[in-house]
Curated annotation (Swiss-Prot):
DNA-binding region ranges: 281-314
Keyword Cell cycle listed: yes
Keywords assigned by UniProt, alphabetized: Cell cycle, Cell division, DNA-binding
Domain of life: Bacteria
Protein name in the entry: Probable cell division protein WhiA
Organism the protein comes from: Thermoanaerobacter pseudethanolicus (strain ATCC 33223 / 39E)
Record-linked HAMAP family: HTH_type_WhiA
Gene: whiA
Amino acid sequence: MSFSSDTKDELARIYPEEEESKIAELAALIRTIGSISMYGNGKISLTFTTENASVARLVFKLIKDLFGIIPETMVRRGRYLKKTLSYLIFVPDTKIAEEILGKVKILNYEKGHIKLNYGIDQKIVKNSKAKKAYLRGAFLGGGSISDPEKAYHMEFITHNLEHGKDLSKLINSFDLNSKVIARKNNYVVYLKEGEQIVDVLNIMGAHSALLNLENIRVYKEMRNNVNRIVNCETANLTKTINASLRQIESINYIKETVGLDYLPPNLKEVAELRINYPDLSLKELGQMLVPPVGKSGVNHRLRKIEEISKKLKERRVQ
């Protein structure tokens, strides 16, 4: 199972205690996996469709507890290449469907006409627990999280721009920074920062998923730090090797053309050590001198040797 599926299974096991929270969560589920069918003579039915059995059980229980009815259920297997199971929760009775849609503030009657509310009615998210329940329902119905090993991305898919904007505002009321974009015929509310995704998981109550994500974040950060250190040390080592090769080349040129006795005693001493110990660092070379010399002092002498080699080459060309 994916990280996203595991998170949904965890969230679907959380059952709200307060009626306000139950209504809020059901409202979000209707917005994301619910469909309202309107027929002639003012008949209405309500259907939920999901591929997650845990989500289907949650919808069934919410409707049963809030409205005292047993909704119809059906399991359908996909055709052709897609053989996954779909779970349908069906409320065919117009009176009950209207009661549910009215309770969650999606359906209103104005002057004898039915009016659909596409946004989130503030009356159903008037407290913190209800907001969290709504967010949980929105994720269970239309949310997903990418594999945190690869990228940090959480999104909520909704079919309506007004609902997308309201959902983004609800998320951002917890000091987060979600954004809304259009994608094909839907709208996507998304977050891309690991820290903010952790916050959303905490808000929804997905504590196991949160801990897993935090562990992955810590591991990735440690791995990145190690890689940076290794890259830095590799770069420094390459720089040291290149400098050593350049210095040895200069010393050998002096040795082959005029001899090392051409150099002042202090430079000759360093030159001989560098040839005999090509792998030593400047600090280690300095410790072998009598008296010992610091890293900057050794570097200064070797640069002097390179300058002498360069002048000898220029003189030879002339």
